[in-house]
Design a protein with these regions (language model features):
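Rossmann-fold cofactor-recognition segment
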Residues: 1-8
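Glycine-rich NAD(P)-binding loop of the Rossmann-fold in SDR/ketoreductase-type enzymes
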Residues: 5, 47-55, 131
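Active-site Tyr-X3-Lys motif and surrounding loop/helix of classical short-chain dehydrogenase/reductase
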Residues: 12-16, 43-50
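Rossmann-fold scaffold of SDR-type NAD(P)-dependent oxidoreductases
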Residues: 23-35, 52, 70-78, 159-160
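Catalytic loop of short-chain dehydrogenase/reductase
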Residues: 33, 37-41, 46, 72-152
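Hydrophobic positions on the long internal alpha-helix
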Residues: 55, 59-63, 67, 139-140
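C-terminal helical subdomain
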Residues: 58, 160-168, 175-231
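Flexible, glycine-rich beta-alpha linker
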Residues: 81-83, 148-177
């Protein structure tokens, strides 16, 4: 078990894999610290961000250099990872970021606002999952901007994944999941996406929807294999 909220653990694990195997072929970052509607965001935000956001950037930071030719480095996020899920006044917080450190700082500014009780007045969503997912997608986009040419020349795909609505204990308290698939039903299309050859370079660095076609939250349907708009 790897505790991604402890960044030294992520670094040690990456070093161990490099020493034993010389590199990695597939990394799926799919960790999630759940929250319940009755939780006080100010009380849970620190661990939530450490695991879901700083843990994600730590994985990207330490595993991207280890990817072998044809590798896949994918972050399981959500269609809520689009800036369109945020109030327009907040979009600039996640635009024009140049490094993973910039992403961490942007996320921590939001975290501090939640911790101090200022988030509602700054029109941040009440559900902390939304800014967190946007931070994950922003991290992938920033790293992709740095690695695109080199990665594509080696057949490496770096992207974030929207698996669609899934009936899980983490989502059930927040969403109407009537008819939503179970996790094992979603695993197959995700693995198909991971294992198939990279034939569409436009997916690199993007948030790619691989689940069922769903009514989009942005006024359009989201189809399997399509890119969820960033803004």
């Amino acid at each position: 078990m790897l505790d991604v909220s402890k960044r030294n653990c992520v670094a040690r694990f990456a070093d161990e894999l490099a020493a034993r195997h010389g590199g990695v072929d597939i990394v799926l970052s799919n960790h999630y610290a759940r929250v319940e509607p009755e939780d006080d965001p100010a009380e849970v935000i620190d661990h939530y961000v450490e695991a879901n956001n700083l843990g994600t950037t730590s994985i990207l930071r330490h595993f991207a250099p280890l990817m072998r030719d044809g590798g896949r480095l994918l972050v399981i996020a959500s269609r809520a990872g689009s800036l369109r899920a945020l109030a327009p006044a907040l979009h600039s917080r996640f635009q024009n970021l140049r490094s993973l450190e910039d992403v961490d700082r942007a996320v921590c500014v939001w975290r501090d606002a939640v911790r101090a009780g200022r988030a509602p007045g700054q029109v941040w969503p009440a559900w902390i999952n939304i800014p967190s997912k946007i931070g994950q997608v922003a991290a992938v986009r920033v790293l992709a901007g740095q690695r695109r040419v080199a990665d594509l020349s080696r057949g490496i795909l770096l992207a974030s994944i929207s698996p669609g609505l899934i009936d899980t204990g983490a989502s059930r308290p927040w969403l109407d999941l009537a008819g939503a698939p179970q996790p094992d039903e979603v695993a197959a299309p995700v693995l198909d996406f991971v294992l198939r050859p990279l034939t569409d370079e436009s997916l690199y660095g993007e948030l790619v929807h691989v689940g069922r076609e769903e009514p989009g939250p942005f006024g359009m349907p989201i189809r399997a294999g399509s890119v969820v708009p960033w803004q």
